[in-house]
Amino acid sequence: MFTQCITVLFERAPTLADLKAVLTADASEAPAAEAEQGWVLTGPSLTLDHRKDVNGKLQIDVIDQPFPDAMGSPDREPTLFAAWSMGHFGPTTYPGALERACLHEVDRELVALAEKHTAFVRIRVSYVLGASSDATVLPDHYDPIHELAAVSHLAIDLSTIEGALVLFNPNAERLLTGQRLRTALDRAPILPVDVWTSVRRVRPQQLPDWLIFDTVGMGQLDVADHQLVLPIDHGTAVHAAALLCSMAAYDAAHGGVLSPGDTASDTDGRGVTAEWSSEATLGPPRAVLAWVPDDLEEIPQELDQPDLPEA
């Protein structure tokens, strides 16, 4: 039902009037019956046109609750469980996204801000709101890059409202400021995957002499995430984050052309080769293109276990 989702975490819930005051486009308020579906599915909301020719809508709703990081259960919290299952918090979002975002965030001030939030504003895209039951979820000539850019610009505007704390992209498990996002978008035509995704560096507890680098969030752009595992003293380690970011941007810009067997190299000429992995080493659950250094003879079997704890 929804193809993108970015949120703004707030110290207190803003009003729809607060939202309208910072928006440059005309927005219509949701009918009362729609807002009464329950805060999990739709809070008090505004709707803006995105692509009118295919019924594209940008929906912005106010949730006067903390971000629900747990999925709930079909027995005790059926509405929350259904909302997660239907992608109401993002099409590629998994439970625990905010917890993992805080765990991996280097800027601890952003984490402190996120921990203060009591409400959030959710920005989503849909092509089936108010449409007939046979409407397609994805229209012809669907462009996830243009779509995510539109949602990002709205998030930047909403981050200027009094009480806004930090942006949270649950699909990318990423915290960032509106200014950081604006700076990245202003670099166009360079694709800002460095803010649309998380590029993580993890030293596993069982094998502290190894490092795991990966991306989270490329599913927003309809391409695979990337992963690179290597010894901590390997020459590519200092280039790994930039290398993954570069390959992710290339893959997204060209519509997902990278595949197993493809090769790349870091700035010092050390080669890596792609393999397909149906399960990433680190959560959230997803398939990844796993890049392997050409001079690496073997990766320990322990690194094949999902969700390794950090050292």
Per-region residue spans from a language model:
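Short, extreme N-terminal segment that most often corresponds to the first beta-strand
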Residues: 1-54, 66-68, 287-311
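Conserved aromatic-histidine-acidic binding/catalytic patches
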Residues: 7, 139-147, 232-236
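Short beta-strand-to-loop capping motifs
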Residues: 8-14, 125-127, 232
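Short, well-ordered alpha-helical segments
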Residues: 17, 149-152, 238-242
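Structural alpha-beta junctions
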Residues: 28-37, 149-167, 249-258
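N-terminal low-complexity, intrinsically disordered segments
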Residues: 29-32, 36-114
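Internal, hydrophobic cores of structured domains that mediate oligomerization or house catalytic pockets
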Residues: 76-196
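Aromatic/basic-lined ligand-recognition segments
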Residues: 170-310
